Amino acid sequence: MDNTNRLRLRRGPSLRQTKFTRSRYDSEEVSSIEWEFISMTEQEEDLISRMYRLVGNRWDLIAGRVVGRKANEIERYWIMRNSDYFSHKRRRLNNSPFFSTSPLNLQENLKL
């Protein structure tokens, strides 16, 4: 083991690695409490669910198929859609007058 390797070991990770990890965590890590519900079209929801059944939680592959969406955005959508923790937010959205695809609103629209 020569002297340069010893110096490198003593110094720890390079500045480039620490900058990368710091910027990655600063940009992507957000507390789940601060998440806003992500609205997707029916086509996007269908595509995401089919892709998830096909490839699992490989969000990069799924994001490659959904135009204009990032992998972390799709992952957050999936977590919020399928997690018990966010069920109260979904219920609140379904009861709002602006959300027109709830079963009650569909029945009312059919009667008209």
From Swiss-Prot:
Q: Which cysteines are joined by disulfide bonds?
A: none
Q: Which UniProt keywords apply?
A: Developmental protein, DNA-binding, Nucleus, Transcription, Transcription regulation
One Pfam family of this protein, by short name?
Answer: Myb_DNA-binding
Q: According to its UniProt record, where is this protein located?
A: Nucleus
Alphabetical list of CDD domains matching this protein:
SANT
Recorded GO CC terms: nucleus
Segments forming domain Myb-like: 41-78
SMART domains assigned to the protein according to its UniProt record, in alphabetical order: SANT (SM00717)
Oligomer and partners: Interacts with GL3.
Q: What does this protein do?
A: MYB-type transcription factor involved in epidermal cell fate specification. Acts as a negative regulator of trichome development, by mediating lateral inhibition. Promotes the formation of hair developing cells in H position in root epidermis, probably by inhibiting non-hair cell formation.
The record's misc note reads: Overexpression of ETC2 results in the suppression of trichomes and overproduction of root hairs, as observed for CPC, TRY, ETC1 and ETC3. In natural Arabidopsis populations the single amino acid substitution of Lys-19 to Glu might affect the stability of the ETC2 repressor and causes reduced trichome number.
* Name of the protein: MYB-like transcription factor ETC2
